Amino acid sequence: MSSSSRGPGAGARRRRTRCRRCRACVRTECGDCHFCRDMKKFGGPGRMKQSCLLRQCTAPVLPHTAVCLLCGEAGKEDTVEGEDEKFSLSLMECTICNEIVHPGCLKMGKAEGVINSEIPNCWECPRCTQEGRTSKDAGEGPGRRRADNGEEGANLGGGWKLTEEPPPPPPLPRRKGPLPAGPTPDDVPGPPKRKEREGGNEPPTPRKKVKGGRERHLKKVGGDACLLRGADPGSPGLLPPRVLNPSQAFSSCHPGLPPENWEKPKPPIASAEGPAVPSPSPQREKLERFKRMCQLLERVPDTSSSSSDSDSDSDSSGTSLSEDEAPGEARNGRRPARGSSGEKENRGGRRAIRPGTGGPLLSWPLGPAPPPRPPQLERHVVRPPPRSPEPDTLPLAAGSDHPLPRAAWLRVFQHLGPRELCVCMRVCRTWSRWCYDKRLWPRMDLSRRKSLTPPMLSGVVRRQPRALDLSWTGVSKKQLMWLLNRLQGLQELVLSGCSWLSVSALGSAPLPALRLLDLRWIEDVKDSQLRELLLPPPDTKPGQTESRGRLQGVAELRLAGLELTDASLRLLLRHAPQLSALDLSHCAHVGDPSVHLLTAPTSPLRETLVHLNLAGCHRLTDHCLPLFRRCPRLRRLDLRSCRQLSPEACARLAAAGPPGPFRCPEEKLLLKDS
């Protein structure tokens, strides 16, 4: 029964969370790995969105939303005291089928489960163990990390096998001396081949019941014990789920044998003592080779298949997985190694080793063979060809060139508006390329458009305008960030009426040439948002020693209709010292203390302010009017719609304004001729 038929969500993996207790979780970023270099705090672009390599949790836990697949409840191990009861009520995740269940909810009599001792709440559930399903690679699964010396660290700690049956009889004792030259096959039987099972006296067993028919026991897995097969040729041997490699396991069992006898497999020689293995017919051999080839072809394209499917195929194929295996080698139980290195031999399915000539055939399951990798194709970066330079002359239909050069045509195009330029771009390809010149597009107006399409954004970038009006548009943060990163020469930007969600893109886009910024009537702007906009960027690139704010070079700032307080004005005076025009109209929190901050002796705007708009600020009174005499360069002061300001006080200020008198074309509007 497959995992897909066990209920909805049976095979869905739960993303584990940090334990927040291990050494990797409590440390800080290293700042040197490629993930740290990508982070914005270390000067990177921030595209990978990954944490530091040294901060990867070594014991991730299940999320708090994980529940049992059978009863639908969370883990309740904290409500009991005994170890067995805690284990029965805790949630366990299977590494094969990814099911999360309580061990007590599984109603299985004769079954075993292998607990992973490194990762919490992780095991191989009894259902998968009973069906004979294993992981794709038993040596590289979760919790089986290799140590620095090349050995598997999980083998030192070991796992536990849980069962309800009595333990089997003890295994054969380890031999101390050299093996006899000619033992009978009943002493240490080799692995039963598929053809031998079909042609022998024993009835064939189902493929998935090979591992499920083992005798279960409760045994600590670990140490250097090498378990061979029992005396009963029908029962497969019990092996620990993790071994170091074939050479180490064999040397620990038989220390008296020289390495040259067991490192390289040799073909067995038929002896008179042992019975001969019956050879299959040529038709059956062709059928077996065809089945193996079909299995290999099915595995090559399906690299992302589930572990249960690949393991069942590996178990059913036995020891005959090689496509180019000779018939004689298949009958004698020998399979050529896939590679010369010990790692490839360790990752193989079953490995047959003959210690000496005429010796017994020893075999142990080292895990199923992984599916072969698909052929890797060469990858090349395909870049578009460079654009050819623009022609200096206009080719005519007759084959000659127009007498006017490109510079003369551009001077003619400068007298045309945007609509006429778009018409000229449709005349010919040469005019279309000439009309993209940025001198023809000093200002582009896209205001009051509900949405901006990608062709519109691409057209703006190709024209490189100096002033861009995006007021009252539905531009998104991603679109605005894409635009600003490609308009480094932008001097004027109008974003009035947009949402702060999109305007917040200004915090991550460099605008070195910006001189005018219009942020009037932006929704949901508080002191915290304005502080984020005014403060220097936290991701200063390496080599930049000065911490300049984003608005250091801005000369005109329009903040009408925002909820600004005196704290925001202090930040404004500190991080925007070059302002000559400031619009604070209709700001409800601006009053007499705000005017005192703007005109204080320590204020940098006292000497640079030329235009000041305070229209609609209802908290201003007549007491703040004498403070404006501190600004010697003030040429325009707009106090219209200020309810608490009297016209007589404004007239007295206009008559005695420094260094000369103001004129009042309208009530509460003070102008001075330069």
Curated annotation (Swiss-Prot):
GO molecular function annotation: unmethylated CpG binding; zinc ion binding
Protein name stated in the entry: F-box/LRR-repeat protein 19
Zinc finger (PHD-type) stretch: 65-131
Organism classification: Eukaryota, Metazoa, Chordata, Craniata, Vertebrata
Residues given in the record as Zn(2+) 1 binding sites: C19, C22, C25, C57
Stretches with biased composition (Low complexity): 302-321
Gene Ontology process terms (BP): proteasome-mediated ubiquitin-dependent protein catabolic process
Superkingdom of the organism of origin: Eukaryota
CXXC-type Zn finger ranges: 12-58
Subunit structure comment from the entry: Directly interacts with SKP1 and CUL1. Interacts with RNF20.
Region Disordered: start-end pairs: 130-400
SMART domains cross-referenced by the UniProt entry: FBOX (SM00256), LRR_CC (SM00367), PHD (SM00249)
Domain F-box: 398-444
Intrachain disulfide bonds: none
Binding-site residues, Zn(2+): C68, C71, C94, C97, H102, C105, C125, C128
One Pfam family hit: PHD_4
GO annotations of cellular component type: SCF ubiquitin ligase complex
PTMs per UniProt: Acetylated by CREBBP; leading to ubiquitination and subsequent proteasomal degradation.
Residue ranges with Basic residues bias: 206-220
